[in-house]
UniProtKB/Swiss-Prot annotation:
Protein name per its UniProtKB record: Large ribosomal subunit protein uL14
Domain of life: Bacteria
Subunit structure: Part of the 50S ribosomal subunit. Forms a cluster with proteins L3 and L19. In the 70S ribosome, L14 and L19 interact and together make contacts with the 16S rRNA in bridges B5 and B8.
Gene coding for it: rplN
Recorded family membership: Belongs to the universal ribosomal protein uL14 family.
Role noted for this protein: Binds to 23S rRNA. Forms part of two intersubunit bridges in the 70S ribosome.
Keyword annotations: Ribonucleoprotein, Ribosomal protein, RNA-binding, rRNA-binding
PANTHER family linked to this entry: 50S/60S RIBOSOMAL PROTEIN L14/L23, LARGE RIBOSOMAL SUBUNIT PROTEIN UL14M
Length: 122
């Protein structure tokens, strides 16, 4: 469950390390974002010579949350940290690699590229 001011790890090699949510997209008063939702983020920490620089604003898709996601069979998938993947204007990932597992809930037409790059799909 991500809201404004939440900080997330970046799960791709775009150059950003930590980002902060500045807006949850999808409705005028939408408060929370979960796995698979798109948010606007500001880069708070970046590596030198990366594509993303500190202070840049990007769209991002949430790929892991501490809150987790409930499956139809009743099971819950939770993670230790919140994480997101930075997206360009076409909602394609900026990085060419994805770090860590992602959930099966990302398997929509929009995010199949992220699922195919991920080392593990839970």
């Amino acid at each position: 469950m991500i809201q404004m001011q939440s900080t997330l790890d970046v799960a791709c090699n775009s150059g950003a390390r930590r980002v902060q949510c500045i807006k949850v997209l999808g409705g005028s008063h939408r408060r929370y974002a979960g796995i698979g939702d798109i948010i606007k983020v500001s880069v708070k920490e970046a590596i030198p010579r990366g594509k993303a620089k500190k202070g840049d604003v990007y769209s991002a898709v949430v790929v892991r949350t501490k809150k987790g996601v409930r499956r139809p069979d009743g099971s819950v998938i939770r993670f230790d940290r919140n994480a997101a993947v930075l997206l360009n204007a076409n909602n394609a990932p900026i990085g060419t690699r994805i770090f860590g597992p992602v959930t099966r809930e990302l398997r929509t037409e929009q995010f199949m590229k992220i699922v195919s790059l991920a080392p593990e799909v839970l």
